[in-house]
Curated annotation (Swiss-Prot):
GO terms for molecular function: rRNA binding; structural constituent of ribosome. This is Large ribosomal subunit protein uL22. Part of the 50S ribosomal subunit. InterPro entries: Ribosomal_uL22, Ribosomal_uL22_bac/chlpt-type, Ribosomal_uL22_bac/org-type, Ribosomal_uL22_sf. HAMAP family: Ribosomal_uL22_B. It comes from Nitrobacter hamburgensis (strain DSM 10229 / NCIMB 13809 / X14). Signal peptide: none annotated. GO terms for biological process: translation. Keywords: Ribonucleoprotein, Ribosomal protein, RNA-binding, rRNA-binding.
Length: 128
């Protein structure tokens, strides 16, 4: 009486990694995600290595996890991996209060984000 096993949502030539609870706004995280979208995995890692954005280290860690998932769990060739998707979602928002003038208080929003990276193995083109 158990539920039927759920089919794999990704094709056989793809692997993914998800980073949750990243303490940065989704808008700022999306700036870094745009850098790696559609790039080869090795080039994307190099871009993140030398990026000056604070969140680039967490994005690099998530990309390395996706590459490791592709290699270890799905037996894909690391040299042929391309970042197929890199998308950002909203996380929770912590609300804090800061004192303002005349005994009032103002809200401060501290947003969190989620990052999903999907890598795909592409076949190397035959050079003519």
């Amino acid at each position: 009486m158990s539920k039927p096993k759920r089919e794999r949502s990704l094709p056989e030539n793809e692997a993914k990694a998800i980073a949750r609870m990243l303490r940065v706004s989704p808008q700022k995280l999306n700036l870094v995600a745009q850098l790696i979208r559609g790039r080869k995995a090795s080039a994307a890692l190099a871009d993140l290595q030398f990026s000056r954005k604070r969140i680039a280290g967490d994005v690099k860690k998530c990309l390395e996890s996706a590459i490791a998932n592709a290699e270890n769990n799905h037996d894909l060739d690391v040299d042929e991996l391309v970042v197929a998707q890199a998308f950002v979602g909203n996380g929770m928002v912590m609300k804090r209060f800061a004192p303002r003038g005349r005994g009032r208080s103002g809200r401060i929003y501290k947003p969190f984000s989620q990052l999903t990276i999907v890598v795909r193995q592409v076949e190397a083109e035959a050079s003519a």
